[in-house]
Amino acid sequence: DPTVINGGVINSIKNNAQLGKGEWAVIESDESDGSFLKLPITYSIVTNLDKEHLDFYGSFDSLKKSFFKFIEKTPSFGKALICADDNNLKSIIKNLKTKNFLTYGFAKNTNYQILNVRKKLNYSAFDLKLRLIRSQIYTIKNIKVNLIGEHNITNATGCIAIALNLGIEINKIKKALNKFTGIQRRFTKIFSLGKKDF
């Protein structure tokens, strides 16, 4: 039962925040003002790095350095999950000194590689190939999320990776994903007209 602070309204709780009774806090943060560097982290998901907020950072190089610092501060008992599909993040991965990170995405040779995506009208299904240790390569079949769009599959994969690192069983993870109905105003279906969804 974690405390949750999110940037958008979570459909299941009709709010963007919830005070939990557990030890964990799940926070959606961004790099807009540099305050994400002050967050105490154990696990993080780094989804993408774009040329944004340059009014604050002054240059893209300065922005990249802030992401580098954020990932480097991952403690030895935690992990940063980095999306290897993002070209700007790839350049950071190459220069990391820390070993406390794992990669995920559609890209080949990631630690958590998305495979066999099946896109349906109201949900997406996919398989996940895990490469954690050379002798430990296996595939989790038929993961379903009640969301559409490759970005939602990628985001779900980052969450799955953290849950697995925390020792949560895959069946429990799949059950939780089946219950998740998304965030308001993020690829939200508003209405249907004929065979088209808007």
Residue spans of the language-model regions?
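Switch II (G3) loop of P-loop NTPases
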Residues: E23-D33, D197-F198
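Short beta-strand segments
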Residues: I5-N6, E28, T47, C83
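Switch II of P-loop NTPase G domains
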Residues: S32-T42
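Short beta-strand-centered segment that lines the nucleotide-binding/catalytic pocket of NTP-utilizing
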Residues: D1-S12
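Acidic, Mg2+-coordinating active-site environments of NTP-dependent enzymes
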Residues: S12-K14, Q18-K21, I41-F198
